[in-house]
From Swiss-Prot:
Domain of life: Bacteria
GO molecular function: 3'-5' exonuclease activity; DNA binding; DNA-directed DNA polymerase activity
Alphabetical UniProt keywords: Cytoplasm, DNA replication, DNA-directed DNA polymerase, Exonuclease, Hydrolase, Nuclease, Nucleotidyltransferase, Transferase
Organism: Streptococcus pyogenes serotype M5 (strain Manfredo)
Catalytic activity: DNA(n) + a 2'-deoxyribonucleoside 5'-triphosphate = DNA(n+1) + diphosphate
Pfam families named among the record's database cross-references: DNA_pol3_a_NI (PF14480), DNA_pol3_a_NII (PF11490), DNA_pol3_alpha (PF07733), DNA_pol3_finger (PF17657), HHH_6 (PF14579), PHP (PF02811), RNase_T (PF00929)
Sequence ranges assigned to domain Exonuclease in this UniProt record: 427-583
NCBIfam families reported for this sequence: dnaq, polC_Gram_pos, PRK00448.1
GO annotation, cellular component aspect: cytoplasm
Name of this protein: DNA polymerase III PolC-type
């Protein structure tokens, strides 16, 4: 053994007997590689032989543990002089391999770790079942096994797999039997569920006759048989069968037409035992119409044969007969005026917990004849706006509430404290063990205590108590106490009296004292003994306040941290003694660190201001009683999310008290404090707490059933007794008792959807904590929480007697609903912020600019347009919106950035004049920059002013300026000019954060908020949840059932977020709580902006919303301006060179073959995608107007494909005449002779895809008017195909930006390529890019092949786009340089003559921070070694190696050598 190796063995304290083994005789350290940045040490050992497996594991574990203490990761491998290939040793190491990455992947380990291995003919042979002996494992996993065995010292082995028939048959048999058991259990479970569902149905009504078809006589008997056929539950079908009959609901339908004209209806049905895929063929349209009843939501009876679908490989019914059936929905059968009101209902806005939309909840209550229904989502009010609108529509009162998380502001450390010296006090530190957590329903089985003085135990108390019944397995497992411990124990009352004597003249101490003291007091009260009145210290709260930096303050973690012995946690005597030891550590630290000497100081001086963060949460339901209450509710929600958020939104009790006006409080569910007090402290304690509330909630016994499983309540009788106790609490506290349903879904069969959603949260969620331990441990079942009718609710409470049940279910809930006033949740008007003299300023800026361009007096056409627009803008209070946008654009312009407009704002000439948009919506015209003379073309013959021929002003000879896109104002603010303006602006991505801050600066921090969004579970995500549930809970679902469950679980709120550029501005004469609560996005309390709590769409017609979006175009323009010094405003929109790009490549000096495309569109915004390039190739645009058409066609839906494209190909129309942008419809129809109002209405119907959805009468009226004015039929037919259209103003703004970029591509190419790669390129491969044309083209060909085979990754697709531009640049004679350690910038590409030098950030895996660090470090001095580059430059070893491979580092030396133990520890 070498000295160095021996030193290492001493360091890791390797056992001497192992060190003396023969394997260690010549042990040595061959090499150590030290990676300082990653703190990884690689050891390479030499041994005489392969180590015994126990020795290897000991060496491995001690190395890891020792170096972990110094925050160093360790790996090692072994070279063995002699290798023993005995089966036992090989088998042991083979199994050990699966404990090491990457062999420990789940699929490899589960399939291979238990297999047998042998060594034969110089090969390691693995005997495997046939189904794992495949190429996947051979290719992806066996090489890893070879490497791991080599690291163990076996050298490079050849591994082969052989199929073991016996093993294959055995495992197959086990799998089949396990699967059959799963299916059998699923069948039984679902059949029972169906029986339960049927039992809840109201009496069957006589079915309405199904629609009859003219079948031939010979089908009559078959139809009769169909009517009487036995219905088969879907769950029972496992194989192909004939003439099966199902009844169920259709939940998915897809209709297709084959090339031969036949139709196929693929649909899915469920009967709630399972689901099935079905298909029905129809030979023609007439037969297809017979099956219109196959629609989503329809209930059908179907008969057909079950066959395996050759495409989906799933069992599918080929339907032969189908008829619609009556589905008997649940109804509330109580008479009018005798129906309950549900006051505790969750919607899908209760995060990952409830299913119904607020609309469906309200619709169900209204359908049942209920006069009101409450919304009580968990800690949020995001369903309020939709609930408000739906309730008004349904004619039902919506009661707006929430289920809040209430906490005490400062949970006390000491109860009933007195003036007492802590150092001189005597303490009784006690603990109790019980059969459950309920003092009223469970029993004491042990009381133990240590009496302590100055840190010493002076006396002990330890008594078991016989509860009079056998202990449950759970209690024994948790506490370690058995029935044997309790034999011969003293009676409870004797122990209680003895313990009271033991505790005299002392301070009581317990960990989580509220539980122990509550349990003791409940038992004292039950036996007429005095309750605890002496001071109590809770060591749990003591620890939380003394050591807030600790994450866990349970007894177990604390004893480990302070090295206090706790041998038998959950036995009272051991827990009490350990708690006592901790107490005196706490007292010492409190005295030394905080000066705490007196008992009174614990609460006054030590309890932290933010102790609410650790306080135990209790639920309460809060309801809005009036408009004042609504605003207070919004404030509470805001405070709970902004100021008091800790894991969940919390409302401290004092905060609730300060905002309680206009609110009513209920005691909520089993997580409420009154229910908890009844369960754990007794009725007296519950009465005291109940006085704080306005009513007591009781829920159906089924809701409390999980408490029985968790052993908090003994049985059904125990649940009923708790409910009676709650009623007694209400009586004694003089509070009404109301029966609520805790609704989480509407129908009983929807329970499974909630189950899937909740279980997807994993065991970290409280609701999923398992009962018991071990493999069989499962979470408690979820309660039956569907929306119950009055009859169902009365049945649930029948045990109370008819009169009392009716009182709590009907009378009291109706009375409460009557106390609630109607409130306005969403305001009916727009409230814009106030800017002094906004109207005057907008008008002044408009006329000032108009006079500057068009002269004074203005041309009539300009004057009339301005007057028309200002009348609308100023008259409807929109001036402040215009002015705010102008101020934002102006500020960004002053910082050197252009701002592009989006949407239809370019339809407003006032917006153009005050600088919001560059788009001029007037008809095409000339205007003289010198004398302001102008000429307007108003006959529609010219599509864009930029296409007018150049000519001089006839008055002064100055060359005319050209402008005007002919866009009507109506497309922005509606025909009457009263639509709230939606001004969307494209700021440079670099300047967007500054623009956002400008809003705050203009309007004030307290009035500007990011527009909030709500993220829900997508159906694909829900599909994953279903598959996870299926896996984790031993379920087996066919594909159609998975689809149904995924659809049912989708739509539930999962998180919140923010619009990428939306800023909501609250009027400065109101506050945000007049409109919405506020919060942080995704509960990120470190976020710099607060968001609206409501989805911004819910209030976008009430407050100003500014869309300040980030976009690459303004950033690119700024970059080009910085590189060239050219003002982009001066770039002409009709440059011949730029227009030549759209017809060929000659202007670039290359051929189409060189760059792989027939035009010069590569890298041009709006026109560079494959789709638009194809459109350009087909249409050959030559004018700005035609480019606008292309932009509109490419952004619309069903405007180009199957529409304009065909018209152009067939020669029916041209690019100029087809419908391209929405505004063109109105302009064209007015030029054709239609009235402006009708032209506008037709445009609106077409652009929204409503042409075929409006009534035939309305549509025919439009068609007649168009034909009367000679509008061609092809135009009318084209209107009917359109689903969505792009605004012309949006197209004009985008095209104008694109042409400016294109100008640089043509006239200043190296600058264009520099800007493109700096800003737009998403992926780089620097070695390929700098290796020249051949390398670039070869890589492009490689990716092209992968694309054809659908093998290209997203990164490769992005890279291909980059390489297209690189290829074009190189073909044009420019060069792409290598990354240079001393010349490259961190972020931007650099121009060196005709060469581009890439920045550091272009290197894969090198982020912005490291790039900036390298540039900063090189300014401080040359890098002398790779180690220095890693240390000073912050580059990882991987990045340094990559730079070295690319030749960037030249001959830079390697890392400095380190001694093995330098810097160790």
């Amino acid at each position: 053994m070498s000295d160095l190796f021996a030193k290492l063995m001493d360091q890791i304290e390797m056992p001497l007997d192992m060190r003396r083994s023969s394997a260690f005789s010549s042990a040595d350290i061959i090499e150590v590689k030290v990676h300082s940045v990653s703190r990884l040490w690689e050891f390479h050992f030499a041994f005489a032989a392969v180590l015994p497996i126990a020795t290897y594991r000991e060496l491995h574990d001690r190395l890891i543990r020792t170096f972990e203490a110094a925050d160093i990761k360790v790996t090692f491998d072994i070279q063995a002089a002699q290798v023993d290939y005995s089966d036992d040793l090989l088998q042991a190491y083979y199994q050990e391999a699966f404990e090491h990455a990457p062999c420990n992947s789940a699929s490899f380990k589960s399939s291979f770790s238990k297999l047998k291995v042998t060594y034969e003919n110089d090969k390691l042979i693995i005997a495997a079942p046939r189904f794992v002996n495949n190429d996947h494992f051979r290719k992806n996993h066996l090489p890893n096994l070879v490497k791991q065995l080599e690291a163990f010292g076996f050298g490079t082995l050849t591994i082969d797999m052989v199929s073991d028939q016996e093993m294959t048959e055995h495992l197959t048999k086990d799998f089949v039997s396990s699967r059959q058991a799963l299916v059998k259990k699923a069948v039984q479970d679902n059949l029972e569920a169906q029986k339960s569902l049927e039992a809840m149905m109201p009496p069957v009504e006589e079915a309405t006759p199904a629609p009859k078809f003219d079948y031939k006589e010979r089908a009559a008997k078959r139809q009769a048989g169909f009517e009487k056929a036995t219905i088969t539950p879907m769950i029972e079908i496992e194989t192909e069968e004939n003439r099966i009959v199902f009844e169920g609901m259709v939940f998915d339908v897809e209709r297709k037409t084959t090339r031969t004209g036949r139709h196929i209806i693929n649909f899915k049905m469920t009967d709630y035992t399972s689901s099935f895929a079905l298909q029905k063929w129809a030979k023609d349209d007439e037969e297809l119409r017979k099956f219109d009843m196959i629609a989503k939501g329809a209930w059908l009876r179907v008969q057909g044969n079950i066959e395996t679908n050759p495409f989906t490989k799933s069992l599918t019914m080929n339907v032969q007969q189908v008829k619609e059936i009556v589905h008997h929905e649940r109804k509330d059968l109580m008479p009018e005026g005798q129906k309950r009101v549900e006051l505790h209902a969750h919607t899908n806005m209760s995060t990952m917990d409830a299913l119904p939309t607020v609309e469906s909840l309200i619709d169900t209550a209204a359908k049942w004849g209920h006069k009101a229904v409450a919304i009580t989502d968990h800690a949020n009010v995001q369903s309020f706006p939709h609930g408000y609108h739906r309730a008004r529509k349904a004619g039902i009162k919506a009661i707006f509430g929430l289920e809040a998380n209430i906490v005490e502001d400062k949970a006390p450390i000491s109860y009933d404290p007195v003036d007492m010296d802590l150092h001189e006090a005597t303490y009784v530190v006690f603990d109790v063990e019980t059969t459950g957590l309920s003092a009223m329903n469970n029993d004491l089985i042990q009381i133990a205590a240590s009496k302590m003085f100055k840190g010493n135990i002076v006396e002990q108390f330890d008594e078991f108590i016989d509860p009079g019944h056998p202990l449950s397995a759970f209690t024994t497992e948790l506490t370690g106490i058995t029935d044997k411990h309790l034999q011969g124990a003293k009676p409870l009352v004797t122990v209680l009296k003895a313990f009271q004597d033991f505790c005299k003249d002392s301070i009581l101490v317990a960990h989580n004292a509220s539980f122990d003291v509550g349990f003791m007091n409940a038992n004292y009260e039950r036996h007429d003994l005095p309750k605890i009145t002496q001071p109590v210290i809770d060591t749990l709260e003591f620890a939380r306040n003394l050591y807030p930096e600790y994450k866990r303050h349970g007894l177990g973690p604390l004893t480990k941290r302070f090295q206090v012995s706790l041998d038998h946690h959950h036995m009272a005597n051991y827990d009490a003694e350990a708690t006592g030891r901790l107490l005196f550590i706490f007292l010492r630290d409190a005295r030394e660190k905080h000066g705490i000497k007196n008992l009174l100081q614990l609460n006054t001086d030590l309890v932290a201001e933010d102790s609410y963060k650790k306080a135990r949460i209790k639920h309460a339901t809060i309801y809005v009683q009036n408009q004042v209450g609504l605003k207070n509710m919004f404030k509470l929600v805001s405070l709970s999310n902004i100021k008091y958020f800790e894991g969940v939104p919390r409302i401290p009790r004092t905060v609730l008290d300060a905002h309680r006006e206009g609110l009513l409080l209920g005691t909520a569910c089993s997580d409420g404090e009154v229910f908890d007090a009844v369960l754990t402290k007794g009725i007296d304690a519950a009465v005291d707490l109940a006085k704080y509330y306005d009513f007591i909630e009781i829920m159906p016994p089924a809701i409390y059933q999980p408490l029985v499983v968790r052993e908090l309540i003994k049985d059904q009788a125990g649940i009923e007794q708790v409910i009676r106790d709650l009623i007694e609490v209400g009586k004694r506290a003089n509070k009404p008792v109301l029966a609520t349903g805790n609704v989480h879904y509407l129908e009983p069969e929807e329970e499974i959807y909630r189950e899937i959603i909740v279980r997807s949260l994993g065991q970290g969620a409280m609701i999923n904590r398992t009962i018991g331990r071990g493999e069989g441990a499962q979470p408690a079942p979820l309660p039956k929480a569907h929306f119950r009718t009055t009859n169902e609710m009365l049945d649930e409470f029948a045990f109370l007697g008819k009169d009392l049940a009716y009182q709590v279910v009907v009378e009291n809930t109706q009375d409460f609903a009557d106390r609630i006033e109607e409130v306005e949740v969403v305001k009916g008007d727009l409230y814009t912020p106030y800017i002094d003299k906004a109207e005057e300023t907008v008008a002044e800026l408009t006329y000032q600019k108009a006079f500057e361009i068009y002269g004074n007096p203005l041309p009539d056409i300009i004057d009339l347009r301005i007057e028309k627009e200002l009348t609308s803008i100023l008259g409807n209070g929109f001036a402040v919106i215009y002015l705010a946008s102008q101020m934002l654009v102006n500020r960004s312009n002053e910082r050197g950035y252009l701002v592009g407009s989006r949407g239809s704002v370019g339809s407003s000439f006032v917006a153009t004049m005050i600088g919001i948009t560059e788009v001029n919506p007037m008809p095409p015209h000339y205007v003289c920059p010198s004398c302001q003379h102008s000429e307007f073309i108003t006959d529609g013959s010219v599509g864009s002013g930029y296409d007018l021929p150049n000519k001089p002003c006839p008055k002064c000879g100055t060359p005319y300026q050209k402008d005007g896109q002919d866009i009507p104002f109506e497309t922005f603010l509606g025909f009457d000019g009263d639509k709230v303006p939606d001004i969307d602006l494209n700021f440079s991505g670099d300047d967007q954060p500054s623009a956002h801050l400008d809003v705050r600066d203009i309007f004030g921090d307290e009035y500007a908020f990011r527009a909030g969004t709500v993220g829900t579970v997508a159906e694909k995500t829900a599909y994953g949840f279903v598959k996870g549930y299926e896996r984790d809970y031993g379920k087996f679902y066919r594909d159609a059932e998975v689809d149904r469950l995924a659809a049912g679980a989708a739509g539930v709120k999962r998180t919140t977020g923010q619009h990428p550029g939306g800023i909501v501005v609250i009027p400065n004469y109101m506050d945000v709580y007049d409109f919405t609560p506020v919060q942080y996005p995704a509960d990120d309390v470190t976020a710099s902006w607060q968001t609206t709590h409501f989805n911004f769409h819910d209030i976008d017609e009430n407050v100003l919303k500014l869309d300040i979006l980030g976009h690459d175009d303004p950033t690119m323009i700024r970059k080009l301006q910085d590189l060239s010094g050219i003002d982009p405003i001066t770039i002409p929109a009709d440059d011949p060179g730029v227009m030549a790009l759209f017809s060929g490549t000659e202007i670039l000096g290359v051929t189409p073959e060189q760059i792989g495309t027939p035009t010069g569109m590569l890298g041009i915004p709006e026109f560079g995608t494959n789709f638009v390039r194809g459109m350009v190739n087909e249409t050959h645009p030559t004018t700005f107007a035609e480019l606008l058409q292309l932009s509109g066609l490419s952004h619309g839906t069903d405007v180009w494909l199957g529409n304009a494209q065909d018209l152009i190909k067939e020669g029916v129309a041209t690019l100029k005449t087809v419908i391209g942008c929405r505004d063109d419809i109105m302009v064209y129809l007015m030029h054709a002779g239609l009235e402006p109002k009708m032209a506008f209405t037709i445009m609106e119907r077409v652009r929204k895809g409503l042409w075929l959805k409006i009534s035939e009468e309305e549509r025919n009226g439009y068609i007649d008017a168009m034909r009367e004015n000679n509008v061609p039929d092809w135009y009318i037919e084209s209107c009917g195909k359109i689903k969505y259209m792009f605004p012309k103003a949006h197209a004009a703004a985008y095209v104008l930006m694109a042409l400016r970029v294109a100008y640089f591509k043509v006239h200043h190419p190296i600058m264009y390529y520099c800007a493109y790669f700096s800003i737009r390129a998403k992926a780089f491969e620097l070695k390929t890019m700098s290796d020249g044309l051949d390398a670039v083209k070869a890589r492009m060909e490689d990716i092209t092949i992968k694309r054809k085979n659908n093998e290209a990754t997203n990164v490769e697709n992005d890279l291909f786009t980059t390489l297209e531009i690189v290829n074009e640049m190189l073909e044009r004679g420019f060069k792409f340089g290598k990354l240079d350690l001393y010349k490259s910038d961190a972020i931007e590409f650099q121009i060196k003559g005709d060469t581009l030098i890439p920045p550091f950030i272009a290197l894969e895996g090198l982020g912005e921070n490291v790039a900036k660090q390298i540039v900063k470090a090189r300014q401080e001095g040359e890098f002398l070694s790779k180690m220095e580059l890693r240390k000073r430059g912050g580059a990882s070893s991987t990045l340094v190696e990559k730079m070295d491979e690319m030749g960037i580092l030249g001959n830079m030396p390697e890392d400095n050598q380190l001694s093995l133990f330098d810097d160790f520890f």
